[in-house]
Amino acid sequence: VILVVEGSPSYAMRALESIQNQDLYDLQIVVVCRDAAPGVRHSLQVAADRDIHIDLIDVEDAKRGACLRAGFAASRGSQIIAMNADEWLAPQSLSKMVDIACDTAADIVFPTVSLDRYDAHRERHSRVLNVAPIVIEDKSSMVSGLSQLILGGLVAQTSGVMYSRSLFEACLLCDKVFRTVGFMACALSRAQCVSGCGDACFHAAAPKLTDAFDPTMYAKVSDDIRALDELADSLSEADSGGRLKLASQKFYFAGLVACIENLCLSPHGVSSIERSARMRDMLEAPRTRQMVAALKDNHRGLGLLFGPIASAKPTRCVMCTHLAAFLNRTGAKTA
């Protein structure tokens, strides 16, 4: 397990202890520190001195992915899991995933993922991404299995997932950025067998969409859907019913809605002129119009924003975004 610790995360020791407490003896924990606060670094050093399973290394390279590469270089295991200090493993999850990997010879094992956020009273609120008992062994099963992963949101979850060592190395050599759909698409395109382990649970921090405006968010969504489209195109012969293409369109719609929410609801956002311009660019993007055309007869359950997005009306999108946020706060349901 590669645990990356940067800055002064308040939950670093919880993450480490969740790995140490796994019911698995043959385990190496590589803790990679970069710019870690002195107090956090000291606590990790004390833990490493007490546990022979822990290898603690420091990284000064500021390049993206340097911590992961250093951690992988120091690792020796046949299976790899990478995670950050604000994430943690539920008890016995690791051993259950190892059992699945050994029983099915899987290159990738997905756990159930709990996306956690904490309110002002430090109470945890979770959204669970359940992994179906999938077994992907050929292109036909890849279409059905990948459709489930896309619709369930797990295709964007790279941390907490177990990879075979050779597969993880291949993705790193392709210079794919971890925590992107591009990394997962690269892994899935090379995997011989993929399995799901619903009994294992990995806790990750829920994405924060409205804390601050992120001008790069739509570019990231565009990169993600491009990687997903390339993977879907490679499986087009097996996707005779168009399930995979439909799942990709819904994934893009969800990402677009998140971008619109970030643009409209961020407390420290942008001017109304810039907001309208950015909104228009997203609504008129060729990929957005393609999605609208694909989902126009299958948009039930997509919420209030599909209509304004389909009509490419920036003002209506802003109004419906605020209305949807109000209805979510009050607990009202929308079609």
PLM region spans:
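Short aromatic/hydrophobic "clamp" motif used to bind/position activated sugar donors
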Residues: I80
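Glycine-rich, basic loop-to-helix element that forms the pyrophosphate-binding segment
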Residues: V59-S75
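Donor-binding/catalytic cores of nucleotide-activated saccharide
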Residues: W88-C197, A204-M217
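Active-site acidic Asp-centered loop
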Residues: R34, M83-A85
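Membrane-interface aromatic/basic loop that binds lipid-linked glycans or pyrophosphate carriers
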Residues: E87, A105-A106, L265-A335
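Catalytic core of nucleotide-sugar-dependent glycosyltransferases
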Residues: D199-P207, A212-S240, A258, S266-T288
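Short, well-formed alpha-helical segments that are part of the catalytic scaffolds
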Residues: G7-N21, G39
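Acidic donor-binding segment of Leloir-type glycosyltransferases
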Residues: Q20-D58
